[in-house]
Each structure stands twice: as C-alpha cells, then as structure tokens.
Amino acid sequence: MTKSKLQIFGQVFSLLILSLFISAIDSKGEENPTPAPEALPGGGEWPQWGRDASNNMMSPATGLPTDFTAGDLQGDGTAEGAKHLKWVAEMGSQAYGTATVKDGRVFIGTNNEKPRIASVTGDKGIIMCFDEKTGELLWQFDIPKLDAGKVSDWEFLGVCSSVIVDGKYGYVVTNRGEIICLDVYGMADGNDGPFQDEAKYASGGLEKLAQAEPVELDEKCADIVWGYDMRSELGVFPHNVTSSSVVISDKYVFASTSNGVDWSHINIPAPHSPSLIALDKETGELAGEEYSGISQSIMHCNWSSPAYSDNLAGKPTTVFGAGDGVTYGFHATEFDEEEDGGETYKLFKELWKVDCCPKEYRVDEAGEAIKYATYPGPSEIISSPVIYNNKVYAAIGQDPEHGEGVGAVTCIDPSRGTGEDAIVWQFKEVGRTISTPSLADGLLYIADYSGRLYCLDAETGEKYWEHDTLSHIWGSTLVVDGKVLLGNEDGEMVILKAGKEYEELTIVNYPAPIYATPIIANNTLYVMTQTHLYAYGFGE
C-alpha cells in the first residue's frame, strides 16, 4: 500500500506511524527505492518517449519470443515469411524517433519521400497514425519544411520527435520548431478546434498562416488543437533539426527548444533565448522558461528530451540534459517572476545542476580548452536523462556526424545537493552516445555510438560486461522479459540476456538501418527501421 493510500484510508495507527516515518526519511533525501513495476503479460501501453515520464526504456511485459524475423518485403507492402508478424507499415525513407502506442493507435514520425497520400508531395515532416490491430493508416500530419534549409531543417530528416498521448490529445515537436497539440482522432470526428486553419498550416506552418493558400482537407488529415511556434515566439535557432520529445505533468508541457549554433558551428544566434520551456497543457500558452544561461554555453544544440518526477528529492522536478553538457533539475510547479519592459516573465527555479562532461574533456593538462568535435573533446547531452530509484542517470555525446569520441555516464543523487556533491559515480569507458540508458533490477544498460553495449551496477557504476555490435548505434536499449534489445546501423536487432552474466541470445536482421528504439505495447513488439514499422504479436 502506498503512502497516498495510507493518507486516504489511514485508520490503522501503526500504518500511519510507518507512513510518517517514511516521510521523515524522504525529507532527509535518503534512499526510497522505486518499486519494480508489476509484470504485465502484454506490457501495457507505451504512450510516450521512454514509456513514462522517467524516460526509462523498460517494459514489464513477459513471454517475448526471440525467434521473430523480418521476412522479405514484397511489392504489396507485406513481409513474406516474417515470423510472429501481425503487420508491417511502410513509412518514408528516414525515421529517427520512437513509436508510441495508446488507445488503439500507433504514432510515428518520418519524412515524405515515399508518400502514403498521393496529394501530399515533396519533402515534408510527417506524423503517421496507424490502427493498432491492423496497421491501417488512419490519418497523417503533413508539416512543411522551413525555408532556412539544412541549417535548421535538414533535408529528408522528417519528424525526429515522438508523440506523447494524453487522453484525446497528442503532443509533438515538429521539424519547424513548433509544439503542436493534436486530436488523436484526426479529422474523422470533425475539426474540434480551437485551431481552425489546418488547410493553411499545410502550406506554411504556424509562421505563415496569414499568407498561406489553403489546401483541401479530408478525414485522413490531422486535426490541430493548438500550436506554439518556438522560433517566432522565443527567437530560438534550431541547429540542423528540431529534435526532442516533450514530457507532460498534470498542468504543463515541458519541451527543449533545440536552440543551437548557426552554420559556422561557432556563433550562437540566440544566446539569451531559453533552452527549455513549459507550456500550459490546455491552451498552449507559455507558462515558464529556463533562465540558467544554457544558451550562452551551447556546444552544438539542445536535442535532449526532458524527464519529469512529481517527487524527486522531495520536489516536483523537471530534469533536463542540456547543450552545455550539464544536467539540470528545475522545480516543475513553482516559477520565479521577473518584470521587464512592463511584462512579467515566469522563470524556472533551478534546484540543482551537475556537469556531466568530465573536466579533462574540457581542458587539457596545460589548461588549454580542448576543441569541440575532436575525439578527446567535450560533449553535450543528446540522450535523455533517466530517473530511477530517486537518482538521475545522464550520458554525454555529440551529433553522429562528428564521429566517435570520449564519453561518460553520470549517476546523480539530487538529495546530496548540487554540483560535484551530487555525483554518485561516473563511468568513462563508454564512448560518445546519443542513446538513453535503460535500468532494471539494479542494472544499467547503455550503448554508445561506437557500437558497444555496457551493463553496469546502477548503484556503484561497476561494469559487469560489454558487447560490441560492430556497428554504429543511434537508438537506445529496451529491457524486457529478462532480455536487452538493441538495434544498430547495420539493420541488426541484437538480443542479449539481461543480468550480470553476459550472454548473446540472437541477432535478427532487417533490410534497413535501425535508428529507433524498439518498444512493446499490448502484446506487441514494434521494430522501426528507417523505412518500415514491424508489429510482432506474442502471448495473446
């Protein structure tokens, strides 16, 4: 029985005393382990990046087979001979985010190089919504490209963010630097509003509604509820692409702005714009913004997806891995207020921060700054911070275009304070990574861009084993049913045994690279390659 239930039903004196005792321990910031999720045969839903607000890529599903196969793709869109396959859906030519599943719908981000709707042509960002049982395309959201080109919206990258679903609404960050709230039913149940300009949005996004020519809409089109343009409203400058998934609380949508450097990789066009913001979940209005100076110290960009906890070291906290290599904890419900020019600004309260980039990566023995984008140089945080057992785990890395280099995974205990005092351990054998750690049963699994997968003790950082996939890795690990699943650039889904003892179970080969993270929802394993989404049924 949890403490909240004790407060509601607390009629037994001894249990009330126990509850007060636990509260006293929590107030001192001592260990209060997160209970392991109960085993669910089908794993439940997967409604957001990281499955829940902790960003921990693990599933309580059981009975997952390891003999599933990709089969041979056919011209009619099927995969002949694929074992355990329920359906396969064709996407565009590139996909970097992760699928999400909620209430009978599957959401993915891709591009439009292989149009699913004949009237939608040209390079665009695309969100597709599929029927969970059949893989039928229910509707899609067409997002025009920015005029800025590759400096802020690289060709054919599509939408790199994952949709988070909350009831009737889905929230996503577009390739245009917008945060959009969508009706998960699309236009099938009408244009619900309050936004009514979907026909104009398709021509120029939120930025060009006034001059855009409307296009014809049908029931396969997306229904926008509200939208917030971070570029227009905040003056931010996304570098190459806007790439981050939002996290939500009961009131707010927290999102990275993807603010970064310009084409020179030296200048920061918007050093005073926020790197993290909060929007009102119902209206899309700006509710708060980061004011810690992150944008002044950006190495490349802010691409990490924030995490959220309603009680981390005794406070509701939004955790952000930033473009300066630092992990921040901000109060998630209280904001400072500052007036300037007759306007009142709500600013995030910084609770703590930890530099996750080791000093020896920033400065050499002679005291000289080490150049960025060199093998021994400093890195920002691109992977997502993970909250597990009242601690935060964060890993540094860079844009894969910069190649391989030194990395680090840092374990942070916010109850210890801020800065170096909050560091529990730091593991430096890992290389640069854009992969998010997964934690289960006291173990941490982390992959690096070089292709290696590490198993560490979550409490001490001790390494138990490592595995080399011999291929670059963009996605993250999924821990499920005593197994660790990990896709790589060679199109291999590597499956290892979870635990302290190393054992490779099998490798499943696909005809295209896997840059996304596999997920499990409702007795189904989803594997997303660059071009197709495979749905495998099990245990039904």
Question: Which residues are covered by each model-predicted region?
Answer:
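Short intrinsically disordered, low-complexity coil segments enriched in acidic
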Residues: T2-K3, F21, K463
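Short, low-complexity, intrinsically disordered N-terminal modules
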Residues: L6, S23-D26
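Conserved S/T- and glycine-rich ATP-binding loop of Class I adenylate-forming
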Residues: M1, L15, W49
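Bacterial N-terminal signal peptides that target proteins for export
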Residues: T2-F13
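Bacterial N-terminal signal peptides
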Residues: Q11-F21
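Noncatalytic, solvent-exposed loop/strand surfaces
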Residues: D26-E540
